[in-house]
Every structure is written in C-alpha cells, then in structure tokens.
Amino acid sequence: MSTKLILSFSLCLMVLSCSAQLLPWRKGQRSRPHRGHQQFHHQCDVQRLTASEPSRRVRSEAGVTEIWDNDTPEFRCAGFVAVRVVIQPGGLLLPSYSNAPYITFVEQGRGVQGVVVPGCPETFQSESEFEYPQSQRDQRSRQSESEESSRGDQRTRQSESEEFSRGDQRTRQSESEEFSRGDQRTRQSESEEFSRGDQRTRQSESEEFSRGDQHQKIFRIRDGDVIPSPAGVVQWTHNDGDNDLISITLYDANSFQNQLDGNVRNFFLAGQSKQSREDRRSQRQTREEGSDRQSRESDDDEALLEANILTGFQDEILQEIFRNVDQETISKLRGDNDQRGFIVQARDLKLRVPEEYEEELQRERGDRKRGGSGRSNGLEQAFCNLKFKQNVNRPSRADVFNPRAGRINTVNSNNLPILEFIQLSAQHVVLYKNAILGPRWNLNAHSALYVTRGEGRVQVVGDEGRSVFDDNVQRGQILVVPQGFAVVLKAGREGLEWVELKNDDNAITSPIAGKTSVLRAIPVEVLANSYDISTKEAFRLKNGRQEVEVFLPFQSRDEKERERF
C-alpha cells in the first residue's frame, strides 16, 4: 500500500514539473494584466504620424539587418520595435531569442525555419549518418598512449633509483631485470586495458553518431508566411533558395512577457558583431558625450545586435560544461575573432525538411491520438505540437473577398492558436487599382502597416477629430496607427498591398461604412437626428454600400465610358 502511495506521489511531482516547463505559455496567462501595455499609456499623445523607412543598417557576412527608429511618438505609444532582415542565398540567421514576443512576416523568398522550445522533445531526426572523424580518433589514441608511456617511464625511473640505493650491485641488477620484466608485463596489461576501454569509447561514440542527429522541429517557410515567437524561444532561419529571403519582424516591447524594461533585447547563441569589442567600447564612450537621443538609438541597436551570450563565460567554465571539445572549439563558441556578424554564409548545410502535407498529416495523427477532439492534455501537447506558421497570401483562404476590389486575410488565435500565448496577430490586405479600404478603427490593438507592394494614399484621424496623417505610402514603409484612430486607404494605379501586425491575438476592427459597419447597426432615426438630416438621407447613408470593408472606387459616368474605351 505504501509503495503505491509513493509511486502516486512521484507521478504527481513529475506532472507538476512538466507543467511548470510550459507554464509561461499556458492559456491561463491571458488572465494576467498587461502591465507593459498600461505602463506606457501616458506616452500616447500622438499629434502627427509619419510613414518611415529603416533608419539604420547593420551588415553581416550574408545579409543585412535594417532597424526602424522606435524613438518616435507613435512607436513609443505602441511599444513596437520593427526590424527587416535580408538573408542572401545560402545565408543563415544565427539562433537567438528575445526578451519580448514578436511576429514575423515573410515578404519574399523561401527558406527553412527552426524553433527550439524549452521543455519540448527532439522529435525530428536527420537521415544522414555521421562518421566519427578518423583523424580525431587517431589523435586521441596517440595522446592517451603517450601519457600512459610517460607515466610508465616515470614509475620505472623511480623504482630503479630506489633499488640502486640498497648497496649491492648484483642484487640491484637482478632485481632491476626482474622489475623490468614485471613492469613490462604491467605496462602491457595496462596498455591492453586502455586499448579495450578506448575501443569501447570509440565504438560508443561511433554508434551515437551513426544514429543520426536529433533536433526540434524545422519547417519550410515562403513569402506570405506569418511566424510568431514567444519570449525566450530560440529561432533560426536558413535561406536555401535562389533569391534573397526578406522578412519584417515586429517586437512587442510592452508585452507582459517582457520582464525587463521598454527595450527589446536579442540574445544570440553564436556569432559576433562585425565590430570589435574595442570599437564598440569606443563608440559607447563617444555616445555618452553626445546627445541623449543618439545614445538611446545606438543603445537600441546594440541591444538587438550586439554580442553572443557565450562570449561572457570563461574558457574554463565552458570546457567543464562542454566536455570532449578542444580549445579551438571553445574559442569559436565564444565568438573570439569572429566578425561575420549574425547572418553567416552556411557551408554544406543540408536539412531534411518535411513538406507541408507531411506536417498536416503528422498533426492529424496527433489529433487522433488525443481522441480527435484537438484538445491538449495540458503538458507538451499544450505548446510543443502547435503550428508556428500560417500563410496569409492565399486568395482561397480570404476572410473578405471582393473580385473587383481586393481581399483581406487574417491570422489570429482562432486559426493559429500559438498567437494566444503572445497576444499578437496579423492581417494581409490586397487592394486592386483605385480600390478603398475603410474607414475603420482597431477596437483593442495598435497596428503597424508595412507596405509590401504598390503605392497609395492613407488618411488617419485621431481623437481630436483632426487628421494626423494624410500622405502617400510606398513599398518598404511602416505606418503605426494607434488604437482607436480611424484610417482609410486608397490604392494607386498599380494597386496597394500591405501587412498589418497588431498587438492582440484577436484584434477587432470596426468599419464605419459598408454592410458590416457601425452605421449599418444604428437605427435610421438615430442617424437622422445625429447628423441633422432627413430620414431619407439617413437611409441612403446607412445602405449606400453593400460591400464588406473593401470598396470599389466611385466612378462618374464619364470615367466609366473612358475605361470602356
């Protein structure tokens, strides 16, 4: 009976321990107040918005990192940090994690994405087999034999010295010969024992290598994919395509997952900045003597792309932790004399990546194992089996579609559940020639509009009833629209396409015109009295547009005739 109680108690402890690994991302986290979102509300007195491009560029061996200036009123209000990464063909964005959650949109290209989640198992295995290097085995064998021989010679010299001190030369000679024969047998026995042990060690290492490499999930990414990441989760990206891989990433510095301050910090596990430490130290001293704004901007750059966290550990500690590696490997772990930056040119990197249909098949099998309900059991299935990407560039999956005006694709926690853990979402909008979106506002989120194609005109109106932005936008620009600000966009002659990244997992927009608009939900009499118009005009105002959010441009009869010819 006591044995059963002990086993039951041990099982409970194991379950609690496993749950603790994944607790920061459990759904219950939503009940926690968004401390950071409330902390910076006093900074949201926005009088003027600007459509901006990256203000700083950081070059690496195989790519470029471009950073927006987040020390503007709208960026401070939203708590956003925006970064664009360009990875050249064959380039590898080194593994890193952040103190804040973020969401990435792949603008162009294709590649491979890796995700490492604490507490999740290594469920992927490469097909290629590794051969333990023969030269390394020989080197270890020669080194061990040399050490063994040295110890044997030292024992021989010590014994001979003791024998000579006894006085009788014949006895010494006889005993020395006897000792020599015994010591020879001892050395031979020790050598054979060492050889067998070394052989077993090499055999064990060889068997370990022959089983192949095991790792956590990797998946293929392409243009239109949205990739989220919680704080502290390691991700890396490899461009195995023929063109540049371009992505835009939005960090939520005000998230409750950020326990530090209002700044975003990236922690790299490899690599090093192209600048030397002395250069960075010199620049830091120069900034301290300069303006506060310049100092803040440069500090933000360094926090995002400064150093490898292993650089700060001493060699002795790393050698104790990572056994069976030489000093050269330890030096490379720390990034000593590595000036390639954080996007490096990969060599002989061949990954077995499951295709999308294989991922779906594996996910369906997991659902069937859970009884087909799709619900998690509260342990690793709560997080480890979640999707880490969703494509928003598929017309067949559009949430709003107007064949003559455009479409809207939304990714939120309903179709990508991991977004519920990080409180972020995205929306991809395509407007055809001269089409219009809005006016509308975000009920519960700030949004960052990043233009991916074309150009158009945008108007934004703030809480004081006056325009805070009225200008054209073009590809590569970001416009931050605070919560509640009404925005309308009209595409140019080449159309307009953009992605909106928002800091709520289920961001809701409220249109002012159209079939699902707020005006459509208000009685005609209320509209008539509100605007001091007749009920007939109020009815026209309410029902003038039958489309949903995406509108055809108004055209006069003459304009229609000109288009026909």
Swiss-Prot record:
Tissue expression notes: Expressed only in immature seeds.
GO MF, any single term: nutrient reservoir activity
Covalent S-S links between cysteines: C44-C77, C120-C384
Keywords recorded for this protein, A-Z: Disulfide bond, Seed storage protein, Signal, Storage protein
Disulfide bond as UniProt keyword: yes
Pfam families recorded: Cupin_1 (PF00190)
InterPro entries, per the entry: 11S_seedstore_pln, Cupin_1, RmlC-like_jellyroll, RmlC_Cupin_sf, Seed_Storage-Functional
Spans annotated as Disordered: 126-224, 271-301, 356-376
CDD domains linked: cupin_11S_legumin_C, cupin_11S_legumin_N
Residue ranges annotated for the Cupin type-1 domain, each copy included: 49-331, 390-539
Basic and acidic residues compositional bias, start-end: 137-224, 275-297, 356-370
Family: Belongs to the 11S seed storage protein (globulins) family.
Further comment found in the protein's record: The sequence of the probable beta chain is highly homologous to the N-terminal sequence of BW24KD, a major buckwheat allergen.
Quaternary structure and interacting proteins, as annotated: Hexamer; each subunit is composed of an acidic and a basic chain derived from a single precursor and linked by a disulfide bond.
Protein name per the record: 13S globulin seed storage protein 1
Name of the gene encoding the protein in the UniProt record: FA02
